[in-house]
Amino acid sequence: MANSPQAKKRARQNEARFQINKARRSRIRTFLRRVEEAIASGDKEAATAALRAAQPELMRGVTKGVFHKNTAARKMSRLAARVKVLG
């Protein structure tokens, strides 16, 4: 339990930041799931559109510190490769 005033403030800030990051992470995962679903359905047009929508969201997550840049790059690369294979 935080005892000093600054520790109490940090605890409040950490909780607020956690909630913001949780929402941001959830939003990004939703965009990635849409790409996965489009790939699973075999619709290249929808998959490409979903990938284009997901990319800026994922990069925004990197900027905001939710994901590491290499993690985001790896996810985008793997999704792009899977979309490219679709006929």
UniProtKB/Swiss-Prot annotation:
Q: Which GO terms describe its biological process?
A: translation
Tell me the GO molecular function terms: small ribosomal subunit rRNA binding; structural constituent of ribosome
Highest taxon of the lineage: Bacteria
Which Pfam families did the record assign?
Ribosomal_S20p
Keyword annotations: Ribonucleoprotein, Ribosomal protein, RNA-binding, rRNA-binding
Q: Which Gene3D superfamilies match?
A: Ribosomal protein S20
Q: Which GO terms describe its cellular component?
A: small ribosomal subunit
Q: Does the keyword Mitochondrion apply?
A: no
Q: Which InterPro entries match?
A: Ribosomal_bS20, Ribosomal_bS20_sf
Record bears the keyword Transferase: no
Here the disulfide bonds are none
Function, please? Binds directly to 16S ribosomal RNA.
Similarity-based family: Belongs to the bacterial ribosomal protein bS20 family.
Name-wise, this protein is Small ribosomal subunit protein bS20
Source organism: Roseobacter denitrificans (strain ATCC 33942 / OCh 114)
Q: Which gene encodes it?
A: rpsT
